[in-house]
Amino acid sequence: MAGKGEGPAIGIDLGTTYSCVGVWQHDRVEIIANDQGNRTTPSYVGFTDSERLIGDAAKNQVAMNPINTVFDAKRLIGRRFSDASVQSDMKLWPFKVIPGPGDKPMIVVNYKGEEKQFSAEEISSMVLIKMKEIAEAFLGTTVKNAVVTVPAYSNDSQRQATKDAGVISGLNVMRIINEPTAAAIAYGLDKKATSVGEKNVLIFDLGGGTFDVSLLTIEEGIFEVKATAGDTHLGGEDFDNRMVNHFVQEFKRKNKKDITGNPRALRRLRTACERAKRTLSSTAQTTIEIDSLYEGIDFYSTITRARFEELNMDLFRKCMEPVEKCLRDAKMDKSTVHDVVLVGGSTRIPKVQQLLQDFFNGKELCKSINPDEAVAYGAAVQAAILSGEGNEKVQDLLLLDVTPLSLGLETAGGVMTVLIPRNTTIPTKKEQVFSTYSDNQPGVLIQVYEGERTRTRDNNLLGKFELSGIPPAPRGVPQITVCFDIDANGTLNVSAEDKTTGQKNKITITNDKGRLSKEEIEKMVQEAEKYKSEDEEHKKKVEAKNALENYAYNMRNTIKDEKIASKLSADDRTKIEDAIEQAIQWLDGNQLAEAEEFEDKMKELESLCNPIIAKMYQGAGGDMDDEGPAPSGGGAGPKIEEVD
């Protein structure tokens, strides 16, 4: 068990568009379906005037409620508002994003009639809560521990922010691992029994919103990431968009009307396009039918696989570039790649498979693992290893992750001096001795950067600190040892020490990059609890309302039944009918009443109806038992007694 008998640990693939959860059970990984029966859950959170929706329920209502339905939180997490990628993404989102304190992007929605602001961590934590609940419903126990995946080139603050999201959701994130590493584990488990010697594996992960290519070597259960490349803005949604644009033009031609100004029409068209795209992976042609798409006009059309491929051909070809870059970075020829693994739903597209297969000179691609589930599968295996759940089958897997970007510091003239080159296996530690730039310099400023450019101004500043108190000396004399230390989770510690005086200073690179403070996390954890209890309240309310509705309609049907009606006095019958009418009218006017009010109404109605019905049954001498339903035993009776 997870260290202290804390129940099973789960693996979560927290995706840009969809998420997936798995658990190690009975010596194998079980990918868990949600309450809708789907093995992947949309990474969507919707806010309405009465409730909060997560997953399928949120995505299903996005057409009616676009500005209060949040998705793509993964594109915001661990980034600053002023970040160029955030600025360009914002243009595409229907929901509002504003700069919060410390340049942190905040998502603004209307919830229960009030304006609320959420950070990306909070939205992601809501998706994580959903995944946790899916696992708990399946396992029948509470789940505390999880392994969560991030893209291979997520930087430090994105990893850290993902961990924070876990904390807010009430999960202990045992480890953050790279998605391709997770896919390789899933794959490695299948293959480990037979493999001898080193294997080179290329992971081709084309998801809903992002595209990642990674090259790994696997030897005797040891995974090493050699190189990563990709495009953070290429995925299934782009293919959907091409189809959407194609049909928007068609609608314009046919009807002389432009639907682009109508978000609901666009959303309905996009949903239909996503469905059509999936269908085209297995058939050559499909139809799109949308009733009353815009201004009452129905839209019917067909699209062939060939047309779909033509609309996206440039994008499909673009998918091959990172594959070449990855091989170049790893200094490897494509002929030395043993296996090519497909991950992500978009790798089901036949054209993508064909282009990739052609690139590797006709090599068979590995498709044995469901591409949507491979990452969660690997995360679940890793969770089992870390919690000591797994058996010997998995215990001897060892994970070596890498740094996605080079790490270094700024030296005189704004030059980037790299201490840890990218694709270095972590955990790792590097030391280097530096000195002062001018005579009698009293201190040095250590500025830590990540990136591949030679000038620091083109790279990303992670943090800085000062080492002061250096005794006066000519330039180049003082010896300052700088140490970069990355742990298994990819968290970076940088320290500097003056050899002569023993003066020391250090920084842990997590905090000043839009990280949440302890207090903020605490607050968010409490809020998450609050929202959860509100969701529970809402559920109670709906149940009480349904119980009352059921009872009223059942009763109405009961007294319409000839056998029963004939045994009621006209007076009693009118009494019941009036009471039911009143109850139904009250229901129509009070859909948002509190659970107690529904329950009180129910009691009122019961106390009037039940004695009359009971009297009738006694009068009938009990020969009615097996005939018309006795409403108190009907849809709603016993359910209610338990409540009060």
Swiss-Prot record:
Gene3D superfamilies per UniProt: 1.20.1270.10, 3.30.30.30, 3.30.420.40, Actin, Chain A, domain 4 (3.90.640.10), Substrate Binding Domain Of DNAk, Chain A, domain 1 (2.60.34.10)
One Gene Ontology MF term: ATP-dependent protein folding chaperone
Cellular component aspect of the GO annotation: cytoplasm
Top-level taxon in the UniProt lineage: Eukaryota
Family: Belongs to the heat shock protein 70 family.
NCBIfam families given in the database record: PRK00290.1
Record-given protein name: Heat shock cognate 70 kDa protein 2
